[in-house]
Amino acid sequence: MRIAILLHERDRGRDLERYHVFQLAQHWRQDGHQVLPVFGTTHFVPADVAILHIDLSLVPQRYRDFAARYPLCMNRAVADIRKTAISRQAVRSGDGWAGPVIVKSELNAAGGPERVNAGLLARSLGKLRGGWA
């Protein structure tokens, strides 16, 4: 089986082993599967299954469209993993909660990937809100 791991174009040349999916890929290879990293959306690499792994809180539409070309793609429907998009469990001013809380950033990994890929967050937010980009 051919497994394509779809990555952001800016991940090319970076240490991919920091992503858990590449640790899993070692096991898939040992089981005889071919695992192929695919960077960006300009070159389609045929595969039986794909895993969309874009290290951003908001996945750009072009990556989701590209992922749709694969017969089966894990994470294809996951466009937004910001805390407010995935959880309603938030304490807000006036809630009257006096107990302990866990403080999380709105963005995945405290927005680190967005800072590394400067400008991507602003463009993504603008598109989601129908604004500039």
Please provide the spans of the model-predicted regions:
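Active-site nucleotide/adenylate-binding loops and adjacent lid/helix of ATP-dependent enzymes
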Residues: 6, 57, 67-133
